[in-house]
């Protein structure tokens, strides 16, 4: 799973995904991409599940790029613990995905295979997505 090697701070603010993405909104590597329609927090496990689903569909042909990286530590308190007494320990990493952000890109496979792979990957993600092509 994806995680930063080193962090400046152990814990982060909850934050919000407010505005549209300013960078990473166009295809940079592949011919087909998966673009987010709404903003949400995507965890490292969800990214990995999407990657596995897409590469299985592609039968390990072609190339897949992941354009997002989970760099925000998300902390949680244990179950059935009373309020207060601190924030809780970091449990996993996530990325705040803004609307319009390209998350996955595919190159080197036929169009129908690429579209099917991106559909399978989008089913693993909590954000609504659309598939974009290079020539759109």
Curated annotation (Swiss-Prot):
Any single biological process term in GO: translation
Claim: rRNA-binding is one of the keywords in the record: yes
GO molecular function, one term: tRNA binding
CDD domains to which the protein is assigned, alphabetical: Ribosomal_L16_L10e (cd01433)
Keywords: Ribonucleoprotein, Ribosomal protein, RNA-binding, rRNA-binding, tRNA-binding
GO cellular component: cytosolic large ribosomal subunit
Cell cycle recorded as keyword: no
Pfam families per record: Ribosomal_L16
Family: Belongs to the universal ribosomal protein uL16 family.
Record function comment: Binds 23S rRNA and is also seen to make contacts with the A and possibly P site tRNAs.
UniProt-listed NCBIfam families: rplP_bact
Quaternary assembly: Part of the 50S ribosomal subunit.
Protein name as catalogued: Large ribosomal subunit protein uL16
